[in-house]
């Protein structure tokens, strides 16, 4: 093949990719459906020599490593799109020399799940705290609150993998289990782990995490490609990030706020201050009302985005229904908070004035008139609000080097960076 032919083919492929990204398939009619799979770790297997000695052993280890990486890539694809049942191998992300031998079974009912976890008679005292959390997730997936969201998703099916790590939770013996089975969403698949919730009273935390990940699976939005959460790969609800990342996580946190008052209180309290990651990866923290932060800065904080959606949902007439409609109507890859808010304002002009007031309050009056119109358009309700308020004097304020220390109790969440599009420290390539 000539160089010219290669360029032509590359151009065609690139054009096709761009077209698909900018023109996604229309949202399917009907509702999403969950497919639950229960998988249990049966053994941790060594799949390569961790300390090869001599050139021959090193050569064999190298070849084996290449083969394992190829097999691991195919395994990740198959677990997402074709989970299947029976004996499976799950390759470690953190230790290239080990893999997990699993037994995977499609869950038919709650009674079946209890049987798989060793409580066929329904005696929940036989379950570990982590197993009880998996049961709580399964039950919440059947709740009315989750069912009401099913038609928001553009996917026909979402696989949910309940990973039971019982017997392998000792971090000293099995240090990689927590990270290798970290709760996440790859879009088509949601992964939940008993290890992560193996403590008393973890049911609600597990359910909130499931709602968070389900919300990611419903969302087409692609986060920024390069370090969406900064150098450390972590994020928290009050961290200054970037526009699409803030939307992706804000949408997921908003859904948690709807179902769980504890999450609502946590997020609303946290966003009174903002965490800013510096070049060296360290954080500083500043009050949200501090002049060093602009209104647009605050719109790139996921918890602020979440609370705006929550207030619209809870304070405006039929707000929840309208928020979900705005989400469905703007579900494209490059969506931002601006797109969804504008879409809401255009479809619901009678709410525009109240919406502008919420936006103004959640950004502490820092958005200029031009910025309010940037997010909401120039409808009569928006213009009426702007005429009645006193706009801030400056449109742009630079963020200086900050020095306030970060509270050690709020260090964010590590992103599991194994996934595709969804963005959460719990979505592959995403976060919670």
Say what each PLM segment does.
Residues 54-76:
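Low-complexity, intrinsically disordered, cysteine-poor segments enriched in small/polar
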Residues 123-192, 199, 203:
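Auxiliary, metal-adjacent structural segments of Zn-dependent hydrolase domains
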Residues 30-50, 70, 74-133, 139, ...:
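Fold-level signature of zinc-dependent metallopeptidase catalytic domains
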Residues 12-21:
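Bacterial N-terminal signal peptides
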Residues 2-12:
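Bacterial N-terminal signal peptides that target proteins for export
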Residues 24-29:
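Sec/Tat signal peptide C-region and signal peptidase I cleavage site
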Residues 208-224, 249-253, 257:
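Active-site recognition of the HExxH zinc-binding catalytic motif
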């Amino acid at each position: 093949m000539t160089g010219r032919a290669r360029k032509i083919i590359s151009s065609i492929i690139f054009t096709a990719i761009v077209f698909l990204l900018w023109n996604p398939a229309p949202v399917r009619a009907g509702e999403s459906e969950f497919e639950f799979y229960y998988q249990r770790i049966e053994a941790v297997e060594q799949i390569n020599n961790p300390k090869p000695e001599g050139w021959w052993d090193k050569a064999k280890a190298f070849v084996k490593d290449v083969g394992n990486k190829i097999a691991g890539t195919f395994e990740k694809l198959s677990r997402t799109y074709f989970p299947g049942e029976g004996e499976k191998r799950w390759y470690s992300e953190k230790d290239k020399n080990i893999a997990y031998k699993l037994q995977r079974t499609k869950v038919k009912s709650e009674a079946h799940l209890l049987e798989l976890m060793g409580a066929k008679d329904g005696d929940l005292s036989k379950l570990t705290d982590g197993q009880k959390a998996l049961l709580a997730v399964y039950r919440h997936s059947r709740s009315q609150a989750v069912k009401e969201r099913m038609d928001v998703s553009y996917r026909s099916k979402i696989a949910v993998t309940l990973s039971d790590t019982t017997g392998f939770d000792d971090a000293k013996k099995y240090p990689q289990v927590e990270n290798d089975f970290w709760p996440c969403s790859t879009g088509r698949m949601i992964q939940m782990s008993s290890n992560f919730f193996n403590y008393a009273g973890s049911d609600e935390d597990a359910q909130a995490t499931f709602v968070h990940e389900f919300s990611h699976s419903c969302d087409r939005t692609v986060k920024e490609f390069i370090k969406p959460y900064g150098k450390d790969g972590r994020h928290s609800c009050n961290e200054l990030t970037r526009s699409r990342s803030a939307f992706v996580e804000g949408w997921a946190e908003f859904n948690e706020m709807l179902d769980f008052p504890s999450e609502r209180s946590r997020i609303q309290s946290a966003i009174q201050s903002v965490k800013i990651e510096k070049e060296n990866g360290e954080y500083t923290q500043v009050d949200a009302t501090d002049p060093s932060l602009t209104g647009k800065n605050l719109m790139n904080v996921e918890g602020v985005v979440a609370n705006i959606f929550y207030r619209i949902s809870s304070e405006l007439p039929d707000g929840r229904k309208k928020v979900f409609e705005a989400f469905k109507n703007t579900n494209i890859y490059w969506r931002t908070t601006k797109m969804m808010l504008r879409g809401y304002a255009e479809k619901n002009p009678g709410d525009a004035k109240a919406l502008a007031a919420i936006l103004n309050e959640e950004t502490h009056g820092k958005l200029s008139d031009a910025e309010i119109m940037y997010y909401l358009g120039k409808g009569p309700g928006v213009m009426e609000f702007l005429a009645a308020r006193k706009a801030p004097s400056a449109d742009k304020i630079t963020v200086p080097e900050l020095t306030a220390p970060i509270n050690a109790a709020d260090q964010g969440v590590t992103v599991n960076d194994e996934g595709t599009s969804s963005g959460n420290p719990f979505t592959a390539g995403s976060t919670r």
